[in-house]
């Protein structure tokens, strides 16, 4: 079972995504199999930060809406490090259970899952926090 970490902040622009990507990369370099989830719809930029934006074909929203197989949304960034990109918009009908189910699917496939949440304290944070342990 993967350890699940939420990286969150009440304010944007404070380096949350930088910290999330650093923790994920360092953990992967130490031999842990790591999944980094960009949970910042509309403003997510981990794909750009990690230099894989040209390879984004699907997002975690495509998994929720059954538009792709779960593995088809993952992007291998480096050895032991995969990214699950964020959708460009956050649909209002997504629930904490929907997001938690996506994370749960990958639970036994990774050692660590880092969730980069959107800025602010709102419904989106509640949804993503429900899938994390720390």
Question: Where are the language model's segments positioned?
Answer:
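Walker A/P-loop NTP-binding active-site region of P-loop NTPases
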Residues: 4-67
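Glycine-rich phosphate-binding loop used to anchor ATP phosphates in small-molecule kinases
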Residues: 107-124
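N-terminal regions of ATP-driven nucleic-acid and macromolecular assemblies
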Residues: 1-4, 129
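Alpha-helical segments flanking ligand/cofactor-binding loops in enzyme cores
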Residues: 25, 104, 126-127
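Inter-motif core of Ras-like GTPase G domains
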Residues: 122-134
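P-loop/Walker-type NTP enzyme "switch/lid" segment
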Residues: 39-108
């Amino acid at each position: 079972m993967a350890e699940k970490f939420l990286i969150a902040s009440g304010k944007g622009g404070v380096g949350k995504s930088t910290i999330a990507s650093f923790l994920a990369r360092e953990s992967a370099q130490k031999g842990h199999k790591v999944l980094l989830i960009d949970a910042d719809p509309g403003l997510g930029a981990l794909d750009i930060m990690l230099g894989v934006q040209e390879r984004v074909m699907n997002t975690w929203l495509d998994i929720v809406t059954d538009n792709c197989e779960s593995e088809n949304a993952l992007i291998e960034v480096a050895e032991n490090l995969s990214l699950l990109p964020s959708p460009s918009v956050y649909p209002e009908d997504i629930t904490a259970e929907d997001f938690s189910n996506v994370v749960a699917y990958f639970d036994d496939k990774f050692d660590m899952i880092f969730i980069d949440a959107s800025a602010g304290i709102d419904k989106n944070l509640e949804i993503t926090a429900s899938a994390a342990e720390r």
